[in-house]
């Protein structure tokens, strides 16, 4: 991880990377984030998503200095196929456009939230995020 400016694991991946049995609370996310950064990553966003709360989708950004909690209301139905990849790509786009890491992460959270809010069904089993939603709906 020393070559990583940022990594974006979900809670299951974060538990593995931090050598923890599980990550199911905000406190455990913070502990995992500190361990992941200690392993060499410069910053981390652990995507708790809908796993941590009954009402909110929670992600936590850590940059070796402070924790930033990003919580938005859960979205139903959540057509979330590709949401993690979309989030990482949106961070990369923000960085390429000159944003700081924290600014890029915060913008990416807004982008993915809009993409999920306006996601669509592909068939009766799965749906995907709407990558045009952030710009189209000015969210």
Predicted region positions:
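Short pre-catalytic strand/loop immediately N-terminal to key active-site residues, enriched for Gly-Thr
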Residues: 67-81
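Charged C-terminal helix
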Residues: 102-139
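Glycine-rich beta-alpha junction loops
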Residues: 13, 49-52, 73-76, 109-112
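Short, small-residue alpha-helix embedded
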Residues: 16, 78-101
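Short, charged, surface-exposed loops that flank catalytic or proteolytic processing sites
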Residues: 22-29, 96-106
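Histidine-centered active-site/metal-ligand motif
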Residues: 50, 81, 131
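Conserved phosphate/ATP/ADP-binding segment of small-molecule kinases
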Residues: 1-66
């Amino acid at each position: 991880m020393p070559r990583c400016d940022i990594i974006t694991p979900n809670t299951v991946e974060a538990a593995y990377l931090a050598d923890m049995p599980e990550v199911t609370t905000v406190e455990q996310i913070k502990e995992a984030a500190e361990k992941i950064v200690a392993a060499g990553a410069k910053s981390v966003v652990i995507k708790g998503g809908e796993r941590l709360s009954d009402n909110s989708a929670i992600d936590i950004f850590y940059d070796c200095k402070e924790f930033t909690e990003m919580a938005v209301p859960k979205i139903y139905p959540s057509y979330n196929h590709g949401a993690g990849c979309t989030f990482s790509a949106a961070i990369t786009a923000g960085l390429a456009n000159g944003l700081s890491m924290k600014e890029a992460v915060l913008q990416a959270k807004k982008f993915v939230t809009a993409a999920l809010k306006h996601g669509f069904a592909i068939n009766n089993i799965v749906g995907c995020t709407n990558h045009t939603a952030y710009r189209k709906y000015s969210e």
